[in-house]
């Protein structure tokens, strides 16, 4: 099967066939977390969406022919504030390290529980200050940046087609949208590339004094370092289109003299919680950790595969309402799928075609459910189901049980058989119910040779 991958490009507002710059090295960059606080459920969506795309690209082009870079922003004013709040007795750099390490470690645990593969590279902003300074110097040399008010700023008027991603005319890009308007700026939309640091802020030596980079230049430097001046796909949440991605494009194109930064720009939709915008003031703010390990949402903990499937049941470009009802629906669906091991079999064509159509995970999940139903009655379909489920990252795993537990279950099953022989049906039913509560599903039958009653059991998902 020759798969034709089509992706919706925010830059063109069209869905078109994807053609990589180099099929031997398909390159994708996705904006990762700012590690000042635990990731919330909205942060989980791009991680899951682009993990599916990563899996699909590896399937199409080969596992060794895809480079996926997802950064960690460990340099931000929010991090500084959290460090001063949580570790007031530590030196600043030690406090910042404590915050970023704890938060990044938790992020890695969270996304692993959501079934996400590790990206090929995961650069941290603080390791690429030299690359950021180099880009800023090039922008100044080329007339796209200037120093004013203790800052180095990008001159948005110096770029004729600034705003092509968001389609916002420059005159409309005034204050707001995380772009501060200050008197020393040439234009209201000019944004910070470098700013001076006080004694209570982290800083690095630069041609413009001790300071730190602006938010946008960080991703330009890291993407360029690992993927080159022009690469294939850049992804992130819808909220990053402006100003972050718009400004990434401006910096990278003007520094390198290219027509594009990435050929395809992809953005996932917003996440609401129980019909409302998620916010701490609304009381519906929930982290991935809380969903996995506490009873904050729906009065119980939720398995990572349930959270993942719940996300994939809506197309990535559509808004999603994250609710207990949605999670219960995803859990019911998963409970009907057979457990399986990873398979080298060919994935189902219907699932592949759905994913190749701009990551239509809704259609892919529907096709996978039909395949699961077939595999439940025809074991020969199980390898295709396993291969297809792995593309979505929702392959139900066989659960290994301790030998002592297996022996205990076998003993109860045998006891129930004895109760049935003795016509003590009430006790047999009680034992069945007891096993069911422990997640054990019984299947009664008859031995073909002796005609005696038999019972097999399996662990329910």
From Swiss-Prot:
Got a GO cellular component term for this one? cytosol
Binding of ATP, residues: 280
- Annotated Zn(2+) binding lies at 31, 219, 244, 248
Q: Does the keyword Zinc apply?
A: yes
From the UniProt entry, list the residue stretches annotated as the region Disordered.
Answer: 436-461
For this chain's record, the cofactor binding note is: Binds 1 zinc ion per subunit.
Q: Which family does it belong to?
A: Belongs to the class-I aminoacyl-tRNA synthetase family.
Oligomeric and partner information: Monomer.
Q: Which reaction does it catalyse?
A: tRNA(Cys) + L-cysteine + ATP = L-cysteinyl-tRNA(Cys) + AMP + diphosphate
Q: The motif 'HIGH' region: which residues?
A: 33-43
What molecular function terms (GO) are annotated for this protein?
A: ATP binding; cysteine-tRNA ligase activity; zinc ion binding
The primary site where this protein sits is cytoplasm
Entry's localization field: Cytoplasm
Biological process terms in GO annotation: cysteinyl-tRNA aminoacylation
| E.C. code | 6.1.1.16
Record protein name field: Cysteine--tRNA ligase
**Keyword annotations for this protein?**
Aminoacyl-tRNA synthetase, ATP-binding, Cytoplasm, Ligase, Metal-binding, Nucleotide-binding, Protein biosynthesis, Zinc
Q: Which Gene3D superfamilies match?
A: Anticodon-binding domain of a subclass of class I aminoacyl-tRNA synthetases, HUPs
The cofactor(s) it depends on are: Zn(2+)
Q: List the disulfide bonds.
A: none
**SUPFAM superfamilies xref list:** Anticodon-binding domain of a subclass of class I aminoacyl-tRNA synthetases, Nucleotidylyl transferase
Which gene name does the record give?
Answer: cysS
Which segments show compositional bias classed as Basic and acidic residues? 436-452
Q: The organism sits in which domain of life? A: Bacteria
UniProt xrefs under HAMAP family: Cys_tRNA_synth
Determine if Transcription is one of this entry's keywords: no
